[in-house]
Amino acid sequence: MGCEVSKLSALCCVSESGRSNPDVTGLDEEGRGESNDLPQFREFSIETIRNATSGFAAENIVSEHGERAPNVVYKGKLENQRRIAVKRFNRKSWPDSRQFLEEAKAVGQLRNHRMANLLGCCYEDEERLLIAEFMPNETLAKHLFHWESQPMKWAMRLRVALHIAQALEYCTSKGRALYHDLNAYRVLFDDDANPRLSCFGLMKNSRDGKSYSTNLAFTPPEYLRTGRVTPESVIYSFGTLLLDLLSGKHIPPSHALDLIRDRNIQMLMDSGLEGQFSSDDGTELIRLASRCLQYEPRERPNPKSLVSAMIPLQKDLEIASHQLLGVPNSATTTALSPLGEACLRSDLTAIHEIIEKLGYKDDEGATTELSFQMWTDQMQDTLVFKKKGDSAFRHKDFAKAIECYSQFIEVGTMGSPTVHARQSLCYLMNDMPREALNNAMQAQVISPAWHIASYLQAVALSALGQENEAHTALKDGAMLESKRNPL
């Protein structure tokens, strides 16, 4: 039982050797490619989203300003292992749930490979949540303004501009020409490091809220006059995005236009791009940015013409986006630890040995022996259940361990991810994969960044015959472990 090679192992081998290179450019019909592999828009329960985000845990916040942001974005994972991004609006936003649902449904009909698409929403009680595809390779702002090893390459910057222009052209063709507060934080990079436009900007932050949250120096002049966003305002914001790509800085449009008028182009261009582009290409992109930033809205180009202007400028089309951006390819398998290898093989005997040796090192201090000894009589009784479960686990009496750990969990005085992980393995040993999956998911709720929870989910999913989901969970576990124990 413990040493058989699992279907998950076979699947992982195929994914490494049999995956074809992804389409790098996607220059098909101006980026109108529909994403047909996504589920239809749906309404989620608050319980589902709480479970997916580990109770809106701080560790799962991915928005730039963390908990201080007016509308916080969390990462999460559904039961089917699909990774999601959850935008949680301020409680005073969208007081009318019907209006919120109507807007979300309209945006949720869009499906395009140039966008991080909206999968659903939740409007239970006072909550207003948007649920979208999760993009794991961060934002344009991170890669452009806060890079660590090298500045973003010219070819990648051009690819960003094209993909976002294609996304805007698609939205316009579907009757959603308004995009609120387009900026470098709205551009995300998917598993393959291809740039995508966040769907969140297609809805305002509240029913009657502002369309722009950035510094007023970057807002379209007509918005300052009227307070209304128009399709032409979106083009102006695209122009500010082009300035970001040209300069590597978030430079006010008025200052950039002064530099352009004075022909002081060197002051505008990012010095890290030296030698990567011709003067003609640089001039053409500056000219396009200037057109987008025209004071009169009617003088600005439309999205279709932006796409037409960007296509001839593309460089290094044969190089995949992950190489240009300098991030690992989604098809690349992270080197697995002994525990990861054991989970890949569904080698339950090896998993048991590793988890037994680990003990409770990964639990928070509240679950240590010292803490238990300081607690009340009820908690002392709880400790007895845990100790009996640990003894049964050590001696491989897995049915007894399940019974004792269940008593510990039912008391509910505290959450121990290790207890849930151990019980999950006990269920696997007793050929109860559904129960094992539930325990592994509960361990992740308590400790969202714990790799062992993802690994055990992978083993349980494989036992349930859900091989694709198991592969995803295994990759997630390997990624979390590599972050926890960097080389």
Swiss-Prot record:
User: Outcome of altering residue 20 to D?
Assistant: Constitutive phosphorylation-mimic mutant
Q: Which domain of life is it from?
A: Eukaryota
Q: Give the modified residues of type Phosphoserine.
A: 20, 213
> How is this protein positioned relative to the membrane?
Lipid-anchor
Q: Which Pfam families match?
A: PK_Tyr_Ser-Thr (PF07714)
Q: Which residues form the active site?
A: 181 (proton acceptor)
Q: Which UniProt keywords apply?
A: ATP-binding, Brassinosteroid signaling pathway, Cell membrane, Kinase, Lipoprotein, Membrane, Myristate, Nucleotide-binding, Phosphoprotein, Serine/threonine-protein kinase, Transferase
Q: Name one GO molecular function term.
A: protein serine kinase activity
Q: Where in the cell is it found?
A: Cell membrane
Q: Does the keyword Lipoprotein apply?
A: yes
What does changing residue 213 to D do?
A: Constitutive phosphorylation-mimic mutant
Cellular component terms per the entry's GO annotation: plasma membrane; plastid
Record-linked InterPro entries: BSK, Kinase-like_dom_sf, Prot_kinase_dom, Ser-Thr/Tyr_kinase_cat_dom, TPR-like_helical_dom_sf
Oligomeric state and partners? Answer: Interacts with ASK7/BIN2, BSK1, BSK5, BSK6 and BSK11. Interacts with BSL2.
Q: What's the name of the protein? A: Serine/threonine-protein kinase BSK8
| Taxonomic lineage of the native organism | Eukaryota, Viridiplantae, Streptophyta, Embryophyta, Tracheophyta
UniProt lists the gene as BSK8
